[in-house]
Amino acid sequence: MELTPREKDKLLLFTAALVAERRLARGVTLNYPESVALISAFIMEGARDGQTVAELMEAGRHVLTRAQVMEGVPEMIPDIQVEATFPDGSKLVTVHNPIV
């Protein structure tokens, strides 16, 4: 199986998001990379499911709470930008203040 660099990046991101989901399920607070991966994967999957950019910008703010991440992580992530594949092509989704 041959994968492009972009496809490899997506798989790595998705794998990191799976690790983050498992840690959350065990009650472990997430660090910076895990938090970014989980929110980014949520956006990418939402795009594939047909949600709009506006819907994902709002929904992305409700994936994680301050209680679910390590101290200082929300301040380290002022926004997250993800290039997601929608049914009508790729678009950039920006989520401002993703952890409330």
UniProtKB/Swiss-Prot annotation:
Q: Give the reactions, separated by semicolons, that this protein catalyses.
A: urea + 2 H2O + H(+) = hydrogencarbonate + 2 NH4(+)
Q: What class of enzyme is it?
A: hydrolase
**What pathway does this protein act in?**
Nitrogen metabolism; urea degradation; CO(2) and NH(3) from urea (urease route): step 1/1
Recorded GO MF terms: nickel cation binding; urease activity
The cross-references to Gene3D superfamilies, in alphabetical order and at most eight, read: Urease, gamma-like subunit
Task: Share what the entry says about its subunit structure, partners included.
Answer: Heterotrimer of UreA (gamma), UreB (beta) and UreC (alpha) subunits. Three heterotrimers associate to form the active enzyme.
Q: What is this protein called?
A: Urease subunit gamma
Q: Gene encoding this polypeptide? A: ureA
